[in-house]
């Protein structure tokens, strides 16, 4: 998928922008706070029907405006034109259209324009709790496996109901408890199986990307942890019932799964430098891109790289740019504050690219840089 052109009105600090993009590399240069991330967020919005940074839609309207509009004009991998429109007025329902036909459900649009975004917020995958790492698995697997998504929805419904029973001050209903536990176990076994299969296939690709970027300076790994590894999930959940009633929530199940992120034999959270952590996260997201491309039929995802070069040495920056400029990846959108070093790298790799300057919400193409 290629985003050929975008039109933006009143989105965050972007009052108006009409931009035509390179089918390969697009770089947005400017100081922090100028609107580079907002521009990438508008591209993200057209894929996921929401902002990557602010889930409250009305707050994404420019302060002086009463509405925002984002329109994207795409070309599929098969050369077919596609138009996506999003509009929101204050205190009104959001409109989302594909080729001028409005969606009945926004969820019908998800997956049509696959996209992977790498941003500073990804640091929470290492530094944060296990919920973010489970969400990472869920986002990838749910985009290509409907059975997984259905099982996850069933599991979460049963978990919510079981937790409500555990908290209830009324007489304990053992029969109803068993109903929810059996649903948790049957759905949870599907979730566990598919997460296990995903991680087993994902790890070699992830390690390959990390090895390339670091030039084999360090070894990395991912280890999947789940209560389901120690036996039948129903027995595990039932055995925890007494303790769960004391705590008021479910302590065992796939909702407690985790990914252990390792540098060598140790947790990267404890041992990794800022540069190693950043490299680890970028390799994770590039592997996610590769996985979605393989499982998504004939659609190449868009790749957004927001301020990813901070904390990386010049060598690793060059390795990453060379990698994503290759044929394995499609259209790329990059933000950076350092115009000079990025321009030198891009000229070295001899691929088509455009450079845009972003200042106080105004975006202008710098043709003289893209020689």
Curated annotation (Swiss-Prot):
GO-annotated cellular components: cytoplasm
One of the Pfam families matching this protein, by short name: SMC_N
Principal subcellular localization: cytoplasm
GO molecular function, one term: ATP binding
Subcellular location: Cytoplasm
Domain of life: Bacteria
Alphabetical keyword list: ATP-binding, Cytoplasm, DNA damage, DNA repair, DNA replication, DNA-binding, Nucleotide-binding, SOS response
InterPro entries assigned: DNA-binding_RecF, DNA-binding_RecF_CS, P-loop_NTPase, RecF/RecN/SMC_N, RecF_2
Keyword presence, DNA damage: yes
Binding-site residues, ATP: 30-37
UniProt record, GO biological process: DNA replication; DNA synthesis involved in DNA repair; double-strand break repair; SOS response
Family membership: Belongs to the RecF family.
Task performed by this protein: The RecF protein is involved in DNA metabolism; it is required for DNA replication and normal SOS inducibility. RecF binds preferentially to single-stranded, linear DNA. It also seems to bind ATP.
Name the record gives this protein: DNA replication and repair protein RecF
Lineage: Bacteria, Pseudomonadati, Bacteroidota, Bacteroidia, Bacteroidales
Gene: recF
């Amino acid at each position: 998928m290629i985003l050929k052109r975008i039109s933006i009105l009143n989105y965050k600090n972007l009052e108006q922008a009409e931009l035509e993009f390179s089918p390969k590399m697009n770089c947005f240069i400017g100081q922090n706070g100028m609107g580079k991330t907002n521009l990438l967020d508008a591209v993200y919005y057209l894929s996921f029907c929401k902002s990557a940074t602010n889930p409250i839609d009305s707050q994404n309207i420019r302060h002086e405006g009463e509405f925002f509009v984002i329109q994207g004009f795409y070309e599929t991998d098969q050369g077919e034109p596609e138009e996506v429109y999003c509009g929101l007025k204050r205190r009104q329902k959001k409109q989302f259209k594909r080729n001028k036909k409005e969606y009945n459900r926004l969820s019908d649009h998800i997956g049509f324009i696959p996209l992977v975004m790498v941003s500073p917020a990804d640091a929470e995958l290492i530094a944060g709790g296990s919920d973010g790492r489970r969400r990472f698995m869920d986002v990838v697997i749910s985009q290509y496996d409907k059975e997984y998504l259905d099982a996850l929805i069933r599991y979460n419904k049963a978990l919510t109901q079981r937790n409500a029973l555990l908290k209830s001050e009324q007489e304990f209903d053992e029969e109803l408890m068993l109903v929810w536990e059996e649903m948790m176990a049957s759905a949870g076994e599907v979730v566990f199986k598919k997460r296990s299969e995903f991680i087993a296939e994902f790890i070699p690709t992830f390690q390959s990307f990390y090895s390339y970027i670091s030039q084999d300076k360090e070894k990395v790994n991912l280890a999947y942890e789940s209560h389901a590894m120690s036996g039948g999930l129903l027995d595990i959940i039932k055995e925890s019932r007494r303790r769960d009633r004391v705590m008021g929530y479910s302590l065992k199940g796939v909702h407690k799964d985790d990914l252990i992120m390792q540098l060598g034999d140790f947790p990267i959270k404890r041992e990794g430098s800022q540069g190693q952590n950043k490299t680890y996260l970028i390799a994770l997201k590039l592997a996610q891109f590769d996985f979605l491309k393989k499982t998504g039929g004939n659609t190449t995802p868009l790749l957004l790289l927001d301020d990813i070069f901070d904390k990386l040495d010049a060598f690793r920056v060059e390795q990453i740019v060379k990698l994503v400029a290759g044929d394995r990846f499609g259209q790329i959108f990059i933000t950076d504050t350092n115009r000079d070093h990025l321009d030198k790298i891009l000229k070295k790799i001899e691929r088509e690219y455009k450079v845009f300057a972003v200042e106080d919400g105004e975006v202008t193409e710098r043709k003289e840089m893209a020689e």
